[in-house]
Amino acid sequence: MPRSFLVKKIKGDGFQCSGVPAPTYHPLETAYVLPGARGPPGDNGYAPHRLPPSSYDADQKPGLELAPAEPAYPPAAPEEYSDPESPQSSLSARYFRGEAAVTDSYSMDAFFISDGRSRRRRGGGGGDAGGSGDAGGAGGRAGRAGAQAGGGHRHACAECGKTYATSSNLSRHKQTHRSLDSQLARKCPTCGKAYVSMPALAMHLLTHNLRHKCGVCGKAFSRPWLLQGHMRSHTGEKPFGCAHCGKAFADRSNLRAHMQTHSAFKHYRCRQCDKSFALKSYLHKHCEAACAKAAEPPPPTPAGPAS
């Protein structure tokens, strides 16, 4: 899983106002959550279980000052891993010391805020699937901010019609239209595989340098977070929990896909049974399993012995 998809935690302000019920704070939410609070569905199809900032800012006591926000992760030395998904993270260390498991709750709003690939906001120029996936989280946020500042202008590809928020994302996409016979195509010096996209070639080169090895089974990986995900198969750790139903996952990408099942927007519909799904992959699985079996004719009944 690319480093750009890591969702950083946001530390809340530890102050409480009179007249307002004590709120709870989710690690990745940017607003306080009231127990049992309900409201109409938001723009992303979820109920906004949050207390608006205006309701507690008005009752702030005179002379009360908020402590300055501290960084969510302390600075680490160059040889240390500050990445929470690294194999040397404190979370993995607690597992190997036999301490209790910790699962953080994540809501879909956290992915809309921090995930560069997140898209589909109602009335807001729904981007395509590959619009900012290569650019990463920071690039995705910058691209969306630039699109809003520029009146929603999108950069369109002249060959396939796909649109992108930034010209750099469009330029990166145009590389995929190159021919393998083009002079701009490059080959891997190790295995000779040809690529027309330079970011794809860069990711491929990492597969020939498997520096991160599992201390349990010896399997090697090109990236520390890939090793971290593999280590969870040994520890049983599931640190990514759904804030809506409580189901936990070992990998953030699996949680992101699961979040779509809670969405009110299900765009993919089966043509045979009219059932709708939030993800195209779920529709494919449904068509291959349930509908495909229902459409098959029953096997012929074997004829009995002739009398």
From Swiss-Prot:
The keyword Iron does not apply. One of its GO terms (biological process) is negative regulation of transcription by RNA polymerase II. PROSITE patterns: ZINC_FINGER_C2H2_1 (PS00028), ZINC_FINGER_C2H2_2 (PS50157). InterPro entries: Snail/Krueppel_Znf (IPR050527), Znf_C2H2_sf (IPR036236), Znf_C2H2_type (IPR013087). It comes from the Eukaryota. One of its GO terms (cellular component) is nucleus. Residues 34-90, 116-148 are annotated as: Disordered. The keyword Transcription applies. Residues 1-20 are annotated as: SNAG domain. Residues 124-148 have a biased composition (Gly residues). GO terms for molecular function: DNA-binding transcription factor activity, RNA polymerase II-specific; DNA-binding transcription repressor activity, RNA polymerase II-specific; E-box binding; RNA polymerase II cis-regulatory region sequence-specific DNA binding; sequence-specific double-stranded DNA binding; zinc ion binding. It is found in: Nucleus. Transmembrane segments: none annotated. Keywords: DNA-binding, Metal-binding, Nucleus, Repeat, Transcription, Transcription regulation, Zinc, Zinc-finger. May be involved in transcriptional regulation. Belongs to the snail C2H2-type zinc-finger protein family. This is Transcriptional repressor scratch 2. The gene is SCRT2.
